[in-house]
Amino acid sequence: MNVAPPTSAPGERQRDPREAGLNVARIAFSPCPNDTFVFHALVHGLVPGAPRFEVTYADVDVTNTAAERGEYDLVKVSYAAVPWLLDRYQLLPCGGALGRGCGPLVLVRDPLPSIEGRHVAVPGERTTAYLLMRLWATNAPPARVSVVPFADIMPGVAAGHYDAGLVIHEARFTYHRHGLRALVDLGEWWESDTGLPIPLGAILARKDALDPVAATTWIKESIRQAWEHPDASRAYVLEHAQEMEPAVVDQHIALYVNAFTEDLGTDGYAAVDALLGRAYAAGLTPPVPDLAPMI
């Protein structure tokens, strides 16, 4: 298996293997099934012409912060974090998470009319989920927001530590088990309001480390192999699936790995422009340059 373990925790200074003249690149993405499914071939040396990758698995709030420091050559981040990163990184047109029917949820234990004046747990300050929630709740904001590890959000809401919790990914398949209900599906809200898919996670390539065109080619080949040979990545995906049931893993991949993962296309870029344009207009992010397709 051609995967090097991380040499240090995210946030610590990592030794750059290229300093020793090695053809190694640093990549970071989440242990979620959509990411491990997409990147399996790439990080296992199955993509011709690609370098060997040193892999870090981390939640997106961690990779958002690490990308600000330029720690990785190829990295999965929230689209909400992209405006702070484009001086160093290039947005790639593939490998990310964008689609319909896959948006974040605001969950509650007890019926609430809104989150106005409430205490809400969120997975990160620069996550797309939180940005969407802020846009949705512009006129009725919560009184308090706490950044909480994703795995602790649903248990915390169920225990009454928070009035509401903002969740993503597999939580949409499992929140009922915690006795919770959805106050709002932010993806449905976004799609109804804009007619566009919801941009969640982006793939960025560090401009001074990788050729973005080459990186795009590698990722597209990794996706092609994932779709053509899904059994090849099965053990790897399940290993990192955080005790997720196989049926939930399959639902997760089916929802988040789609045509937009292979190529953002016209609708994908329009969705990203709409999200970041609205965020800038609301004073929530810096402006971004034109994000026209790279290739």
Predicted feature locations:
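A structural signal for short loop-to-beta-strand junctions that line the ligand-binding cleft
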Residues: 25-26, 88-96, 119
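Hydrophobic residues within well-ordered alpha-helices
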Residues: 67-68, 157-158, 279
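Bilobed "Venus flytrap"/periplasmic-binding protein-like clamshell domains
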Residues: 21-44, 102-164, 168-170, 270
